[in-house]
């Protein structure tokens, strides 16, 4: 279009100790929330909300994962709020172009570190659980899917809100199987953090699912070899895990406090990137502020 467009820049002085930037998502994973509503919900006498912008993408009901797999409303890729993992990083929308620079510009994650410094980079997932001297990857977080993969360990935390983990019966009905599973409910010894060793105590074990999760707790679920691995723990045992996220092209592992993913990296040092025209979706205009 040849019409004039106006761009307004909202500037925040993060050297002021009273100013912060926080990621925000609905109180129940899979539910969506307008930014103006989140603004009001998070505003209080000691926590004033002064601006917001919608910057992530979530799975919609017309996509296969949303339509068939109980993932409608769940973010397409990673989220972190105040050091607490919301959802794991995925390969969503990766692979536009073969050149190194093309790939580096696929997805733009906005990350705020513990020094309140902003970064826009691609990030990769590297989470692990250790029981004794054995370890296994944590493949997903808070993706309460009805079609879980075999031979994996997945995690859920209180960002599930009012929703319980899906029951074994629901999963078996969706997949047409009778596959054993196990869930460990664990209590964290410290606050959530990214790229740091976290410890937790196993407080209960079930094989049916349907677990609701309070703040300070997490559920570890396994099927196949994931089930066999989790079965090595018993109530009262101490387990260790690390929610690993690293900058995809340097390997750096910053102290991530906030993280959210837009669709693509559209501008770098004042210049438009190739992602403005190598995917049609990015030519459209979407107002995102609140």
Segments predicted by a language model, with ranges:
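Low-complexity, polar/charged sequence tracts that form flexible coils or short amphipathic helices
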Residues: 102, 212, 232, 256-258
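C-terminal soluble interaction/assembly domains
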Residues: 289-290
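Short alpha-helix capping/helix-loop boundary micro-motifs
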Residues: 218-232
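Short, Lys/Arg- and Gly-enriched loop/turn segments at beta-strand edges
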Residues: 244-257
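Loop/turn positions that initiate beta-strands
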Residues: 233-240
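Zymogen propeptides
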Residues: 1-219
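Periplasmic peptidoglycan-binding/anchoring modules of Gram-negative envelope and division proteins
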Residues: 284-285
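Short peripheral tails and domain-boundary helices/loops at the edges of structured domains
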Residues: 255-281
């Amino acid at each position: 279009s040849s019409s004039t467009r106006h761009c307004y820049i909202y500037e925040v002085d993060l050297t002021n100790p009273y100013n912060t930037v926080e990621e925000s998502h609905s109180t129940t994973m899979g539910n969506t929330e307008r930014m103006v509503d989140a603004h009001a919900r998070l505003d209080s006498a000691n926590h004033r909300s002064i601006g917001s912008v919608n910057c992530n993408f979530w799975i919609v009901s017309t996509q296969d994962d949303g339509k068939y797999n109980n993932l409608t409303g769940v973010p397409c890729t990673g989220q972190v709020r105040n050091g607490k993992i919301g959802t794991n990083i995925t390969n969503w929308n990766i692979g536009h172009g073969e050149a190194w620079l093309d790939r580096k510009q696929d997805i733009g994650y906005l990350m705020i570190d513990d020094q309140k410094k902003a970064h826009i980079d691609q990030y990769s997932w590297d989470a692990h659980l250790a029981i004794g001297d054995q370890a296994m990857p944590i493949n997903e977080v808070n993706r309460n899917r009805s079609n879980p993969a075999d031979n994996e360990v997945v995690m859920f935390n209180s960002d599930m809100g009012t929703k319980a983990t899906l029951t074994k019966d629901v999963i078996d009905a969706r997949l047409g199987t009778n596959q054993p599973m196990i869930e460990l409910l664990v209590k964290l010894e410290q606050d959530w953090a990214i790229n740091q060793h976290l410890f937790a105590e196993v407080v209960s074990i079930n094989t049916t699912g349907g677990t609701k999760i309070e703040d300070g707790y997490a559920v570890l679920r396994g099927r196949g070899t994931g089930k066999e691995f989790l079965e090595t723990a018993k109530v009262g045992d101490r387990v260790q895990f690390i929610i690993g996220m690293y900058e995809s092209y340097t390997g750096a592992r910053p102290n991530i406090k906030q993280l959210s993913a837009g669709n693509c990296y559209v501008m770098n040092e004042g210049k438009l990137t190739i992602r403005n025209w190598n995917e049609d979706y990015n030519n459209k205009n979407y107002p995102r502020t609140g």
